[in-house]
From Swiss-Prot:
InterPro entries documented for this protein: UPF0251, WH-like_DNA-bd_sf
PANTHER family per the UniProt record, alphabetical: PTHR37478, UPF0251 PROTEIN TK0562
Family designation: Belongs to the UPF0251 family.
Protein name listed in UniProt: UPF0251 protein Sputw3181_3483
Gene3D superfamilies: Winged helix-like DNA-binding domain superfamily/Winged helix DNA-binding domain
Organism annotation: Shewanella sp. (strain W3-18-1)
Coiled coil: none
Organism lineage string: Bacteria, Pseudomonadati, Pseudomonadota, Gammaproteobacteria, Alteromonadales
Amino acid sequence: MARPKKCRQLSSCVPCSLFKPNGIPSVELTHIQLEADEFEALELGDVQRLSQLDAAALMGISRQTFGYLLASARKKVATAITQGEVLRLPSKTDKDLS
């Protein structure tokens, strides 16, 4: 059985709710959900260019967990872009992770 999720500290503000290809209604496309902690990992690791150790400390998680989140987020973003799918971003209420 998996361990319960540890409380994560999130600070990134999500600018919109989704990204999708132009000209195709989103109801006709496959949706991929990017979780709030994955979004935060992308922000800290790829935008702010923090080391995994520093970013993990800011989120209150282990470096290994941060690495898993970052890899998962990158895969979801790459899949959405290359396969023409909808990437759903976390809502503001998703930031209240426990």
